[in-house]
Amino acid sequence: MNYAYPDEKGHYGIYGGRYVPETLMQSVLELEEAYKEAMEDEEFQKELNHYLKTYVGRETPLYFAENMTKYCGGAKIYLKREDLNHTGAHKINNTIGQALLAVRMGKKKVVAETGAGQHGVATATVCALLGLECVIFMGEEDVRRQKLNVFRMELLGAKVESVAAGSGTLKDAVNEALRYWVSHVHDTHYIMGSVLGPHPFPQIVRDFQSVIGNETKKQYEALEGKLPEAVVACIGGGSNAMGMFYPFVHDEEVALYGVEAAGKGVHTEKHAATLTKGSVGVLHGSMMYLLQNEEGQIQEAHSISAGLDYPGVGPEHSLLKDIGRVSYHSITDDEALEAFQLLTKKEGIIPALESSHAVAYALKLAPQMKKDEGLVICLSGRGDKDVESIKRYMEEV
C-alpha cells in the first residue's frame, strides 16, 4: 500500500491543510520548521526517549487479558496499557514531546485546551517539569464534570480558564485557546491535544503518539511471533487511535477498527459519531469530517465521556475512512458503561470511559474471530477520573 501523508502542504488527500488567519501563518510555519529540525536532531530524540522512559514510564505493558478472552470465547484479547503512563493516559506521550519542542523554540509559556482534563493535566505536568508557564482553557460543562482534574492542574501550577461560550465543551475551549495563541504568539507555544488543527499539528501529535503502535508491534511479535489480526482504539479527535494505527497502516493483514461515541444513539441528536454521521467541512484550521447542519453550523457532540465529545475528527482519520484502510464504528453510552464494568470485574482494571468504547467494540468483534487470532485494544487511559460520574449515572438509571 502506497501511503505517504501528509504531503508538503499538510494535506491528507483533500483533508487537513492550514486554514488559519494571517496572524498565525508565520507561527505554524515556524513550528513546522522547528519540528522538522528536532526530528532530525539525535540529541532531541535522545532527550525525548530519556523522559519517555524515566518520567512517563515507557514502555507500557502489552497485557494478555485471559479472563476477557475466556468470557468472549474467540480471539486472544491483549490490552496495550496506556493507562499505566504517568498521569494515567496516552496524552503525556504528546505533551512531553511538544513541551521539549517549545523549550527548543525559546518559548516561555504554553497554552492548551482540554476536555476530560487529561490533556490539561498532562500539559500542566510537563510544564511543571520543564519550568514553563501554563494556561489551560476548559469548557464550563467539562469543568463541572471533571472538578478533580481542574484542581490537579491548579496544583501543578497551571491557570485554568473556564469557557462559558457555546456548549461549554471541548470545541469552545479550542476556540479560546487558539484566540489566546494568536495574541501571545511571540512567547507562547500551543500544545494541541489531538490530531487536529492546522498543519503541522496533526502530524506532530501522530508522530509523538506513534510510540504506542511501535511498541505494540514489537511486543506482540515477541509474544506471538506474528502481528495481531485486529487492533481497536477509541476516537474523539483521534490521537490514541492514530498513534496505535499509524505504525500498522502498511501491514494490510492487520484490520484496524476505530470506535466513536454513539452517545444516546446515532439516530438521535445526542452522539459524537463524526465519521458515521458527519460531512466534510473546516474547523479549527483543518478540513475534516464534522457534525454540522445544512447551513454548516457546527452541531453539539454528546458522549458520556468528556474526552470523546468533539464534533470533528482528525484529517488523517477522515482520509483513512475514505480509502477504507480503517473501519469506523460507534458505541453507545450504555454499551461503554457495560464494557467499563465488565473489564473492571473480569481483569481488575478500571478503564477510562473513552477506552471503554474500544473495549465494548472488541467484545463484539472477538467472538467472531478464531481462537488462534489476536486482537489488541488500546487502553488509552485509566478510569479514576470517571468513577464519580459513573456512580451518578448508575444512581440515575
Swiss-Prot record:
UniProt keywords, alphabetically: Amino-acid biosynthesis, Aromatic amino acid biosynthesis, Lyase, Pyridoxal phosphate, Tryptophan biosynthesis
Xref: InterPro entries: Trp_synth_b_CS, Trp_synth_beta, Trp_synth_beta/beta-like, TrpB-like_PALP, TrpB-like_PALP_sf
PTM sites of type N6-(pyridoxal phosphate)lysine: K91
Pfam families: PALP
Coiled coil regions, renumbered to chain: none
Cytoplasm found in the keyword field: no
Cellular component, GO, one term: cytoplasm
Cofactors: pyridoxal 5'-phosphate
CDD domains recorded: Trp-synth_B
Catalytic activity: (1S,2R)-1-C-(indol-3-yl)glycerol 3-phosphate + L-serine = D-glyceraldehyde 3-phosphate + L-tryptophan + H2O
GO molecular function: tryptophan synthase activity
Family per similarity comment: Belongs to the TrpB family.
Subunit relationships: Tetramer of two alpha and two beta chains.
Function: The beta subunit is responsible for the synthesis of L-tryptophan from indole and L-serine.
Entry protein name: Tryptophan synthase beta chain
Organism of provenance: Bacillus cereus (strain Q1)
